[in-house]
Amino acid sequence: MPGARDALCHQALQLLAELCARGALEHDSCQDFIYHLRDRARPRLRDPDISVSLLTLVVTACGLALFGVSLFVSWKLCWVPWRERGLPSGSKDNNQEPLNYMDTETNEQENSEDFLDPPTPCPDSSMKISHTSPDIPLSTQTGIQENCAHGVRVQRQVTEPTSSARHNSIRRQLNLSNPDFNIQQLQKQEQLTGIGRIKPELYKQRSLDNDDGRRSNSKACGKLNFILKYDCDLEQLIVKIHKAVNLPAKDFSGTSDPYVKIYLLPDRKTKHQTKVHRKTLNPVFDEVFLFPVPYNDLEARKLHFSVYDFDRFSRHDLIGQVVVDHFLDLADFPRECILWKDIEYVTNDNVDLGELMFSLCYLPTAGRLTITIIKARNLKAMDITGASDPYVKVSLMCDGRRLKKRKTSTKRNTLNPVYNEAIVFDVPPENIDQIHLSIAVMDYDRVGHNEIIGVCQVGNEAERLGRDHWSEMLSYPRKPIAHWHSLVEKR
Protein backbone atom coordinates (compact mmCIF):
# COMPACT_ATOMS: atom_id res chain seq x y z
CA MET A 1 0.00 0.00 0.00
CA PRO A 2 2.77 2.47 0.69
CA GLY A 3 4.12 1.84 -2.82
CA ALA A 4 0.73 2.52 -4.47
CA ARG A 5 0.37 5.70 -2.41
CA ASP A 6 3.74 6.95 -3.55
CA ALA A 7 2.90 6.20 -7.18
CA LEU A 8 -0.42 8.01 -6.87
CA CYS A 9 1.29 11.06 -5.34
CA HIS A 10 3.88 11.01 -8.07
CA GLN A 11 1.17 11.00 -10.80
CA ALA A 12 -0.65 13.87 -9.08
CA LEU A 13 2.47 15.90 -9.05
CA GLN A 14 3.12 15.26 -12.72
CA LEU A 15 -0.44 16.31 -13.52
CA LEU A 16 -0.07 19.56 -11.61
CA ALA A 17 3.22 20.25 -13.32
CA GLU A 18 1.65 19.82 -16.76
CA LEU A 19 -1.24 22.12 -15.81
CA CYS A 20 1.17 24.78 -14.67
CA ALA A 21 3.17 24.40 -17.86
CA ARG A 22 0.05 24.88 -20.01
CA GLY A 23 -1.09 27.90 -18.03
CA ALA A 24 -4.29 26.31 -16.87
CA LEU A 25 -3.61 27.28 -13.27
CA GLU A 26 -2.87 30.66 -11.72
CA HIS A 27 0.68 31.82 -11.71
CA ASP A 28 0.85 32.33 -7.93
CA SER A 29 -0.38 28.81 -7.28
CA CYS A 30 2.20 27.41 -9.66
CA GLN A 31 4.99 29.37 -7.93
CA ASP A 32 3.95 28.03 -4.51
CA PHE A 33 3.90 24.54 -5.95
CA ILE A 34 7.40 24.93 -7.47
CA TYR A 35 8.82 26.21 -4.14
CA HIS A 36 7.18 23.29 -2.38
CA LEU A 37 8.84 20.85 -4.77
CA ARG A 38 12.22 22.47 -4.23
CA ASP A 39 11.85 22.22 -0.48
CA ARG A 40 10.98 18.57 -0.71
CA ALA A 41 13.89 17.90 -3.03
CA ARG A 42 16.40 19.59 -0.60
CA PRO A 43 18.14 17.02 1.64
CA ARG A 44 17.33 17.33 5.35
CA LEU A 45 18.90 15.85 8.37
CA ARG A 46 16.70 14.01 10.66
CA ASP A 47 16.60 14.69 14.36
CA PRO A 48 18.17 11.35 15.27
CA ASP A 49 21.09 12.11 12.93
CA ILE A 50 21.73 15.46 14.68
CA SER A 51 21.73 13.85 18.12
CA VAL A 52 24.20 11.19 17.01
CA SER A 53 26.56 13.83 15.56
CA LEU A 54 26.56 15.89 18.76
CA LEU A 55 27.15 12.81 20.87
CA THR A 56 30.05 11.78 18.65
CA LEU A 57 31.61 15.24 18.96
CA VAL A 58 31.35 15.25 22.78
CA VAL A 59 32.80 11.75 23.07
CA THR A 60 35.72 12.72 20.81
CA ALA A 61 36.51 15.82 22.91
CA CYS A 62 36.38 13.85 26.15
CA GLY A 63 38.62 11.21 24.68
CA LEU A 64 41.21 13.77 23.64
CA ALA A 65 41.15 15.32 27.14
CA LEU A 66 41.58 11.95 28.81
CA PHE A 67 44.40 11.14 26.42
CA GLY A 68 46.20 14.39 27.32
CA VAL A 69 45.78 13.77 31.05
CA SER A 70 47.10 10.24 30.70
CA LEU A 71 50.13 11.50 28.79
CA PHE A 72 50.91 14.07 31.53
CA VAL A 73 50.53 11.52 34.34
CA SER A 74 52.69 8.99 32.54
CA TRP A 75 55.40 11.65 31.98
CA LYS A 76 55.40 12.55 35.68
CA LEU A 77 55.39 8.96 36.91
CA CYS A 78 57.68 7.34 34.39
CA TRP A 79 59.79 9.86 32.52
CA VAL A 80 61.12 11.96 35.47
CA PRO A 81 62.20 8.98 37.68
CA TRP A 82 63.82 7.35 34.65
CA ARG A 83 65.74 10.55 33.90
CA GLU A 84 66.90 10.89 37.53
CA ARG A 85 68.08 7.27 37.57
CA GLY A 86 70.39 8.18 34.73
CA LEU A 87 72.12 10.87 36.84
CA PRO A 88 74.92 10.05 39.33
CA SER A 89 74.02 9.87 42.99
CA GLY A 90 76.27 12.78 43.88
CA SER A 91 74.42 15.25 41.69
CA LYS A 92 71.08 14.15 43.09
CA ASP A 93 72.30 14.67 46.62
CA ASN A 94 73.57 18.08 45.74
CA ASN A 95 70.35 19.17 44.08
CA GLN A 96 67.96 17.86 46.71
CA GLU A 97 68.57 18.86 50.28
CA PRO A 98 66.17 17.97 53.08
CA LEU A 99 64.51 20.86 54.84
CA ASN A 100 65.81 20.39 58.36
CA TYR A 101 64.91 23.42 60.44
CA MET A 102 67.07 22.31 63.35
CA ASP A 103 70.09 22.17 61.06
CA THR A 104 69.21 25.59 59.69
CA GLU A 105 69.15 27.09 63.15
CA THR A 106 72.44 25.39 63.99
CA ASN A 107 74.03 26.77 60.82
CA GLU A 108 72.75 30.25 61.59
CA GLN A 109 74.22 30.03 65.08
CA GLU A 110 77.52 28.84 63.69
CA ASN A 111 77.52 31.66 61.14
CA SER A 112 76.79 34.20 63.86
CA GLU A 113 79.61 32.78 65.97
CA ASP A 114 81.95 33.00 62.99
CA PHE A 115 80.85 36.59 62.49
CA LEU A 116 81.51 37.45 66.10
CA ASP A 117 84.87 35.72 66.28
CA PRO A 118 87.76 38.16 66.02
CA PRO A 119 90.08 38.08 63.03
CA THR A 120 93.46 36.48 63.21
CA PRO A 121 96.25 38.58 64.72
CA CYS A 122 98.03 39.06 61.40
CA PRO A 123 95.32 39.55 58.76
CA ASP A 124 97.39 38.27 55.84
CA SER A 125 94.31 37.21 53.98
CA SER A 126 92.51 40.55 54.28
CA MET A 127 93.90 42.23 51.23
CA LYS A 128 92.77 45.09 49.05
CA ILE A 129 93.81 46.55 45.73
CA SER A 130 96.45 49.17 46.27
CA HIS A 131 97.24 51.94 43.82
CA THR A 132 100.56 53.38 44.80
CA SER A 133 101.97 56.77 44.04
CA PRO A 134 105.54 58.12 43.99
CA ASP A 135 107.32 58.31 47.30
CA ILE A 136 106.07 60.88 49.73
CA PRO A 137 108.50 63.82 49.78
CA LEU A 138 110.37 64.65 52.93
CA SER A 139 108.83 68.11 52.96
CA THR A 140 105.62 66.59 54.30
CA GLN A 141 107.48 64.99 57.19
CA THR A 142 107.88 68.16 59.22
CA GLY A 143 105.41 68.77 62.05
CA ILE A 144 102.56 71.19 61.63
CA GLN A 145 102.49 74.08 64.06
CA GLU A 146 99.27 74.92 65.86
CA ASN A 147 97.36 77.94 64.64
CA CYS A 148 97.55 81.03 66.80
CA ALA A 149 94.36 81.39 68.78
CA HIS A 150 94.72 85.10 69.71
CA GLY A 151 92.04 87.35 68.38
CA VAL A 152 89.78 84.53 67.28
CA ARG A 153 86.22 85.51 67.92
CA VAL A 154 83.85 83.04 69.52
CA GLN A 155 80.86 82.32 67.29
CA ARG A 156 77.48 81.41 68.70
CA GLN A 157 74.83 79.46 66.87
CA VAL A 158 71.37 80.38 68.15
CA THR A 159 68.27 79.12 66.40
CA GLU A 160 65.02 79.95 68.24
CA PRO A 161 64.17 83.47 69.44
CA THR A 162 62.58 82.70 72.83
CA SER A 163 63.45 80.18 75.49
CA SER A 164 59.84 79.01 75.96
CA ALA A 165 59.46 78.30 72.25
CA ARG A 166 62.77 76.46 72.24
CA HIS A 167 61.75 74.35 75.22
CA ASN A 168 58.42 73.52 73.59
CA SER A 169 60.29 72.56 70.43
CA ILE A 170 62.56 70.10 72.18
CA ARG A 171 59.62 68.65 74.09
CA ARG A 172 57.79 68.06 70.82
CA GLN A 173 60.87 66.36 69.40
CA LEU A 174 61.09 64.17 72.49
CA ASN A 175 57.39 63.19 72.00
CA LEU A 176 56.50 64.28 75.54
CA SER A 177 52.90 64.79 76.62
CA ASN A 178 53.99 66.80 79.67
CA PRO A 179 57.15 68.63 80.79
CA ASP A 180 58.33 65.61 82.74
CA PHE A 181 60.42 63.20 80.72
CA ASN A 182 58.40 59.99 80.56
CA ILE A 183 61.10 57.35 80.72
CA GLN A 184 58.69 54.51 81.42
CA GLN A 185 56.70 55.24 78.28
CA LEU A 186 59.81 55.26 76.11
CA GLN A 187 61.05 52.03 77.67
CA LYS A 188 57.67 50.40 77.05
CA GLN A 189 57.73 51.50 73.41
CA GLU A 190 61.25 50.20 73.07
CA GLN A 191 60.21 46.83 74.49
CA LEU A 192 57.24 46.61 72.13
CA THR A 193 59.19 47.60 69.04
CA GLY A 194 62.40 45.81 69.98
CA ILE A 195 61.08 42.28 69.38
CA GLY A 196 63.22 40.54 66.79
CA ARG A 197 65.98 43.16 66.80
CA ILE A 198 69.63 42.28 67.17
CA LYS A 199 70.89 43.51 70.54
CA PRO A 200 74.57 44.44 70.30
CA GLU A 201 74.91 44.58 74.08
CA LEU A 202 74.53 40.78 74.19
CA TYR A 203 77.73 40.44 72.21
CA LYS A 204 79.85 43.18 73.75
CA GLN A 205 81.22 41.10 76.61
CA ARG A 206 82.14 38.29 74.32
CA SER A 207 83.87 40.56 71.84
CA LEU A 208 85.85 42.19 74.63
CA ASP A 209 86.93 38.80 75.92
CA ASN A 210 87.93 37.79 72.43
CA ASP A 211 89.94 40.99 72.03
CA ASP A 212 91.80 40.29 75.27
CA GLY A 213 92.56 36.74 74.19
CA ARG A 214 93.67 37.92 70.81
CA ARG A 215 96.04 40.49 72.25
CA SER A 216 97.53 37.98 74.65
CA ASN A 217 98.06 35.46 71.87
CA SER A 218 99.14 38.01 69.25
CA LYS A 219 102.13 37.15 67.15
CA ALA A 220 104.60 39.34 65.34
CA CYS A 221 103.89 40.74 61.88
CA GLY A 222 107.48 40.82 60.73
CA LYS A 223 110.58 42.44 62.22
CA LEU A 224 112.04 45.93 62.14
CA ASN A 225 115.77 46.58 62.17
CA PHE A 226 116.98 50.01 63.31
CA ILE A 227 119.96 51.68 65.01
CA LEU A 228 119.85 54.06 67.99
CA LYS A 229 122.57 56.47 69.01
CA TYR A 230 122.69 59.57 71.18
CA ASP A 231 124.88 62.58 70.37
CA CYS A 232 125.76 64.12 73.73
CA ASP A 233 127.31 67.23 72.19
CA LEU A 234 124.26 68.15 70.10
CA GLU A 235 121.76 66.53 72.50
CA GLN A 236 120.09 64.62 69.70
CA LEU A 237 118.72 61.12 69.48
CA ILE A 238 119.81 59.62 66.17
CA VAL A 239 117.53 56.96 64.70
CA LYS A 240 118.47 55.04 61.58
CA ILE A 241 115.81 52.74 60.15
CA HIS A 242 117.61 50.04 58.24
CA LYS A 243 115.00 47.58 56.99
CA ALA A 244 111.92 45.49 57.71
CA VAL A 245 111.49 41.80 56.94
CA ASN A 246 108.61 39.34 56.62
CA LEU A 247 105.85 41.93 56.49
CA PRO A 248 102.30 40.63 55.89
CA ALA A 249 100.84 41.06 52.41
CA LYS A 250 98.08 43.65 52.15
CA ASP A 251 97.44 43.69 48.39
CA PHE A 252 95.94 41.11 46.05
CA SER A 253 99.33 40.89 44.37
CA GLY A 254 100.74 39.32 47.55
CA THR A 255 102.86 42.36 48.41
CA SER A 256 102.58 45.65 50.29
CA ASP A 257 103.69 49.27 49.90
CA PRO A 258 105.24 49.86 53.33
CA TYR A 259 106.51 52.99 55.01
CA VAL A 260 107.30 53.89 58.64
CA LYS A 261 106.22 56.82 60.81
CA ILE A 262 108.30 57.73 63.88
CA TYR A 263 107.31 59.70 66.98
CA LEU A 264 109.23 60.44 70.15
CA LEU A 265 106.31 60.30 72.57
CA PRO A 266 104.65 62.10 74.20
CA ASP A 267 105.50 64.78 71.62
CA ARG A 268 103.57 64.14 68.40
CA LYS A 269 104.28 67.44 66.72
CA THR A 270 107.70 66.23 65.63
CA LYS A 271 106.96 63.40 63.22
CA HIS A 272 109.27 61.71 60.74
CA GLN A 273 108.34 59.39 57.94
CA THR A 274 110.29 57.17 55.58
CA LYS A 275 109.75 56.89 51.86
CA VAL A 276 107.20 54.46 50.46
CA HIS A 277 108.68 51.26 49.05
CA ARG A 278 106.39 49.72 46.50
CA LYS A 279 105.46 46.07 46.10
CA THR A 280 107.77 44.49 48.65
CA LEU A 281 107.54 42.62 51.93
CA ASN A 282 111.20 43.22 52.83
CA PRO A 283 111.84 46.94 52.32
CA VAL A 284 115.27 48.46 52.88
CA PHE A 285 114.93 52.07 54.06
CA ASP A 286 118.38 53.20 55.26
CA GLU A 287 117.10 56.60 56.41
CA VAL A 288 118.35 58.65 59.36
CA PHE A 289 116.19 60.88 61.57
CA LEU A 290 117.12 63.26 64.40
CA PHE A 291 115.13 64.06 67.55
CA PRO A 292 116.44 66.95 69.69
CA VAL A 293 115.99 65.89 73.31
CA PRO A 294 118.04 66.48 76.48
CA TYR A 295 119.77 63.43 77.88
CA ASN A 296 117.99 63.73 81.21
CA ASP A 297 114.60 63.53 79.47
CA LEU A 298 115.30 60.27 77.67
CA GLU A 299 114.02 58.14 80.52
CA ALA A 300 110.54 59.66 80.18
CA ARG A 301 110.38 59.39 76.37
CA LYS A 302 109.24 56.54 74.13
CA LEU A 303 110.18 55.92 70.54
CA HIS A 304 107.13 54.85 68.56
CA PHE A 305 107.39 53.21 65.11
CA SER A 306 104.21 52.68 63.07
CA VAL A 307 104.48 50.55 59.92
CA TYR A 308 101.81 51.34 57.31
CA ASP A 309 100.76 50.02 53.92
CA PHE A 310 100.30 52.97 51.55
CA ASP A 311 97.17 53.28 49.40
CA ARG A 312 96.44 56.27 47.19
CA PHE A 313 92.64 56.12 47.13
CA SER A 314 91.76 54.80 50.59
CA ARG A 315 93.01 54.80 54.14
CA HIS A 316 96.49 53.53 54.79
CA ASP A 317 96.43 50.20 56.58
CA LEU A 318 98.33 49.92 59.83
CA ILE A 319 100.51 46.81 59.63
CA GLY A 320 101.87 47.05 63.17
CA GLN A 321 103.91 49.06 65.62
CA VAL A 322 107.13 48.96 67.65
CA VAL A 323 107.59 50.85 70.93
CA VAL A 324 111.03 51.38 72.50
CA ASP A 325 111.40 52.88 75.97
CA HIS A 326 113.96 52.86 78.78
CA PHE A 327 116.77 53.94 76.48
CA LEU A 328 119.26 54.06 79.34
CA ASP A 329 118.79 50.33 79.94
CA LEU A 330 119.86 49.43 76.40
CA ALA A 331 123.26 47.84 75.99
CA ASP A 332 125.99 50.14 74.64
CA PHE A 333 123.71 53.18 74.84
CA PRO A 334 124.40 56.07 74.20
CA ARG A 335 126.78 54.48 71.73
CA GLU A 336 125.40 52.87 68.61
CA CYS A 337 122.87 50.10 69.36
CA ILE A 338 121.66 47.75 66.64
CA LEU A 339 118.18 46.46 67.49
CA TRP A 340 115.78 43.93 66.02
CA LYS A 341 112.18 44.29 67.24
CA ASP A 342 109.04 42.34 66.45
CA ILE A 343 106.34 44.38 64.74
CA GLU A 344 103.28 43.88 66.92
CA TYR A 345 99.87 43.71 65.33
CA VAL A 346 97.35 46.25 66.63
CA THR A 347 93.69 46.73 65.82
CA ASN A 348 92.10 49.93 64.63
CA ASP A 349 90.85 50.55 68.17
CA ASN A 350 94.45 51.01 69.28
CA VAL A 351 95.29 53.51 66.58
CA ASP A 352 95.90 57.01 67.91
CA LEU A 353 93.37 59.23 66.15
CA GLY A 354 94.18 62.42 68.02
CA GLU A 355 92.56 64.49 70.76
CA LEU A 356 89.85 67.15 70.93
CA MET A 357 89.50 69.90 73.53
CA PHE A 358 86.09 71.40 74.24
CA SER A 359 84.29 73.00 77.17
CA LEU A 360 80.78 72.41 78.52
CA CYS A 361 78.57 74.94 80.26
CA TYR A 362 74.93 74.63 81.30
CA LEU A 363 72.60 77.45 82.38
CA PRO A 364 69.68 75.87 84.29
CA THR A 365 67.50 78.99 84.42
CA ALA A 366 67.72 79.59 80.66
CA GLY A 367 67.80 75.89 79.79
CA ARG A 368 70.83 76.43 77.56
CA LEU A 369 73.65 73.94 76.97
CA THR A 370 76.78 75.40 75.39
CA ILE A 371 79.65 73.33 74.01
CA THR A 372 82.66 75.31 72.84
CA ILE A 373 84.96 73.48 70.42
CA ILE A 374 88.38 74.89 71.26
CA LYS A 375 90.96 72.92 69.27
CA ALA A 376 92.28 69.50 68.27
CA ARG A 377 95.75 68.06 68.09
CA ASN A 378 97.60 65.18 66.48
CA LEU A 379 94.67 64.19 64.28
CA LYS A 380 95.05 61.25 61.98
CA ALA A 381 96.16 62.18 58.47
CA MET A 382 93.43 61.33 55.97
CA ASP A 383 94.79 62.91 52.77
CA ILE A 384 97.67 61.93 50.53
CA THR A 385 99.46 65.12 51.50
CA GLY A 386 99.78 63.86 55.07
CA ALA A 387 97.20 66.30 56.45
CA SER A 388 93.42 66.59 56.79
CA ASP A 389 90.62 69.13 56.38
CA PRO A 390 88.90 68.64 59.75
CA TYR A 391 85.65 69.99 61.09
CA VAL A 392 83.62 68.98 64.16
CA LYS A 393 80.01 67.79 64.11
CA VAL A 394 78.04 67.78 67.39
CA SER A 395 74.77 65.84 67.74
CA LEU A 396 72.22 66.08 70.56
CA MET A 397 71.14 62.48 71.24
CA CYS A 398 68.35 60.86 73.24
CA ASP A 399 67.83 57.09 73.39
CA GLY A 400 69.73 56.58 70.16
CA ARG A 401 67.80 59.28 68.30
CA ARG A 402 69.47 62.42 67.01
CA LEU A 403 67.40 65.45 67.97
CA LYS A 404 69.63 68.21 66.61
CA LYS A 405 73.04 68.59 65.05
CA ARG A 406 75.48 71.45 64.52
CA LYS A 407 78.94 71.70 63.02
CA THR A 408 81.94 74.01 63.03
CA SER A 409 83.81 75.53 60.14
CA THR A 410 86.38 73.50 58.20
CA LYS A 411 90.10 74.07 58.76
CA ARG A 412 92.16 73.33 55.68
CA ASN A 413 95.30 71.21 55.49
CA THR A 414 96.09 70.80 59.18
CA LEU A 415 96.27 68.15 61.87
CA ASN A 416 96.09 70.66 64.73
CA PRO A 417 93.09 72.90 64.00
CA VAL A 418 91.96 75.73 66.28
CA TYR A 419 88.21 76.54 66.23
CA ASN A 420 87.04 78.47 69.33
CA GLU A 421 83.44 78.11 68.15
CA ALA A 422 80.45 77.80 70.49
CA ILE A 423 77.45 75.61 69.72
CA VAL A 424 74.26 76.15 71.73
CA PHE A 425 71.47 73.65 72.37
CA ASP A 426 68.26 74.43 74.27
CA VAL A 427 67.61 71.71 76.84
CA PRO A 428 65.05 72.14 79.64
CA PRO A 429 66.37 71.33 83.14
CA GLU A 430 63.99 68.39 83.52
CA ASN A 431 65.47 66.76 80.41
CA ILE A 432 69.18 67.37 80.96
CA ASP A 433 69.75 63.93 82.53
CA GLN A 434 68.25 62.06 79.59
CA ILE A 435 70.35 63.48 76.76
CA HIS A 436 74.01 63.20 75.77
CA LEU A 437 76.29 64.71 73.15
CA SER A 438 78.03 62.82 70.36
CA ILE A 439 81.06 64.67 68.95
CA ALA A 440 82.61 63.52 65.67
CA VAL A 441 85.73 64.95 64.03
CA MET A 442 85.25 64.70 60.27
CA ASP A 443 87.61 65.06 57.32
CA TYR A 444 86.07 67.19 54.56
CA ASP A 445 86.42 65.78 51.05
CA ARG A 446 85.44 67.91 48.08
CA VAL A 447 85.09 64.97 45.69
CA GLY A 448 83.90 61.96 47.70
CA HIS A 449 82.08 61.59 50.98
CA ASN A 450 83.40 63.03 54.22
CA GLU A 451 85.22 60.52 56.41
CA ILE A 452 85.09 60.18 60.18
CA ILE A 453 88.48 60.67 61.85
CA GLY A 454 87.26 59.82 65.35
CA VAL A 455 84.41 60.29 67.81
CA CYS A 456 83.83 60.87 71.52
CA GLN A 457 80.77 61.18 73.76
CA VAL A 458 79.82 63.11 76.87
CA GLY A 459 76.79 62.41 79.04
CA ASN A 460 75.46 60.02 81.63
CA GLU A 461 75.66 57.20 79.07
CA ALA A 462 79.28 57.95 78.18
CA GLU A 463 82.30 56.16 79.58
CA ARG A 464 85.12 57.35 81.83
CA LEU A 465 86.12 60.91 80.99
CA GLY A 466 82.94 61.62 79.03
CA ARG A 467 80.77 60.80 82.04
CA ASP A 468 83.06 62.62 84.47
CA HIS A 469 83.12 65.74 82.30
CA TRP A 470 79.31 65.74 82.15
CA SER A 471 78.98 65.30 85.91
CA GLU A 472 81.43 68.13 86.56
CA MET A 473 79.42 70.41 84.25
CA LEU A 474 76.23 69.67 86.21
CA SER A 475 78.01 70.16 89.53
CA TYR A 476 79.28 73.61 88.53
CA PRO A 477 76.51 75.32 86.53
CA ARG A 478 77.19 78.57 84.66
CA LYS A 479 80.91 77.72 84.57
CA PRO A 480 82.71 76.45 81.42
CA ILE A 481 84.52 73.17 82.11
CA ALA A 482 87.19 72.24 79.53
CA HIS A 483 88.93 68.89 79.01
CA TRP A 484 90.92 67.02 76.40
CA HIS A 485 89.14 63.94 75.00
CA SER A 486 90.81 61.13 73.06
CA LEU A 487 89.15 60.20 69.78
CA VAL A 488 88.19 56.60 69.09
CA GLU A 489 86.89 54.71 66.08
CA LYS A 490 83.15 54.91 65.48
CA ARG A 491 81.47 51.61 66.41
From Swiss-Prot:
Cofactor note: Binds 3 Ca(2+) ions per subunit. The ions are bound to the C2 domains.
Binding annotation for Ca(2+) 2: D251, D309, D311, D317
GO biological process: calcium-dependent activation of synaptic vesicle fusion; chemical synaptic transmission; positive regulation of vesicle fusion; regulation of calcium ion-dependent exocytosis; vesicle-mediated transport
Domain C2, chain residue ranges per copy: 220-341, 352-485
PROSITE patterns linked: C2 (PS50004)
Function summary: May be involved in Ca(2+)-dependent exocytosis of secretory vesicles through Ca(2+) and phospholipid binding to the C2 domain or may serve as Ca(2+) sensors in the process of vesicular trafficking and exocytosis.
Designated name of the protein: Synaptotagmin-9
The organism of origin for this protein: Homo sapiens (Human)
